[in-house]
Amino acid sequence: LENTMEAKAQQLGFTTKVVVKAKYTPYGLNENSSYFSWKGNYYTLDQLKTEYLKHSDGSGLKVDLPIFLKKAGIMTQEQFDGDQDTKNSVVASLSEGATATQLNAKTGIIGRFCAVRYYHESVCYYDVLIRHDQNVTEKMALGRYGVVRNNWYHLELQSVSGPGTPWIPDPSDPDNPTPPGTDDDEADAYISVKITINPWTYWTQGVDLH
């Protein structure tokens, strides 16, 4: 379907995109393993527990990790409202498994938009905005983004510089939308994709008129 917009409307809430599901494992961790990210650093579960204990009460991970765990449904409101020892006990007992109070494939999705992120088995998602005219170099110029009728778009993955999000980015999310008013050229990108526009295939046939 065609989706074009005026120059100033080239924003996340309007631009056609492709969501790429991939597995990204940071250097130093076992391939396809589960991990956490916090302030640009990556941790296994055991490493996160160790790092957590290094922080003073009321600061750093002692604040951010309980917020994430509560939103993800692993820490109850009562535990979150309790004293520091209660929170510490929940963190110490963290494990991977299928129950609601264990880390699993849904944890990073339910606990989205927190300072702490959880990537289950290294799965993450990347937004790829469709660039129509690759020759337009000026930011937010008319025709830079969009899908135009009678064109085929070929996307070629070129590089990945970091993990995407543990959830599918969605500007229509009623609780925590990916900011729909963000200009396309200002959106974060951790995956490099080359987009080429392929010509349509033309078919010819001879016709005899009688």
Model region roles, listed by residue range:
Residues L1-H210:
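Extracytoplasmic cysteine-anchoring/structural motifs
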